[in-house]
Amino acid sequence: MNLYLREKVIIVTGGASGIGESICKKLAEEGAIPCILDKSKKNMERIADEITQQYGINAFLVFTELTDIHSCKSAIDSILLKFGRIEGLVNNAGINDGVSLEDGNYEKFIASLNKNVGHYFTIANYVLPALKASRGTIVNICSKTAITGQGKTSGYAAANGERLALTKEWSIELIPFGINVNAVIVAECWTPQYASWISQQANPEEELKKITSKIPLGNRMTTPEEIANTVVFLLSVNSKSISGQFFFVDGGYVFLDRRIS
């Protein structure tokens, strides 16, 4: 299937590792130009080298502190200065920081919202004029915690609920401009962040086996590449009639949150 993404300029926040990295590589495979917004210069440079070697595409790298609105604006300005256009945005960056109701406080909760959803709005706000010009696309990466809860993670769960709400809201607000907006919901996906969490468990191997045994399709973790495949389709012209939708790429996991059942 031709996704018609060649030479399309696509922003990926948090594109220097995990799911974001896989999205950038899949975009490059389709001939698109990934613009990586991240604060890990080392990882960005590594990924850019790999993309050039594998696909002959030069990714555009912008060191960005996503919790700083000035850094966000500067990043978008630099992309527009370089290319003069933007066809797509993937809001992806975030971290499950464990801010709970019992052990957290107001300041920690607001900080969690800022780092996990504030930049979804900020980046989209700065990119909007370019997306209006290109009749582009937004894809918001979200966590299943917004749907199922998890426990001990009020900040992250609330932020992801907001990501889903923004997906619905923007899909309506942006209808006049031909911009479609969708969300991809991630559950148990094997990323460096997830691997770090597993390693902190009392018995990592046993915990991982317990989780995967409750994932219906294949009893295995979702891969970042599987998330990327869905995201890249949603960025393509083949999905322009789809908007305001939530796509669960999770091996059927969220139908019943089996890890806590």
What are these regions (language model features)?
Residues 124, 159, 167:
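Active-site helix of classical SDR
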Residues 9, 16-17:
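Conserved glycine-rich cofactor-binding loop
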Residues 143:
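Residue(s) in the substrate-gating loop at a strand-loop-helix junction
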Residues 100-113, 211:
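Substrate-binding pocket helix/loop in short-chain dehydrogenase/reductase
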Residues 129, 172-176, 240:
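Alpha-helical segment proximal to the catalytic Tyr-Lys
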Residues 1, 148, 232, 243-261:
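Short C-terminal tail/terminal secondary-structure segment
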Residues 90, 175, 180, 242-244:
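Short, small/polar-rich loop/turn modules that mediate ligand/substrate recognition or access, typified
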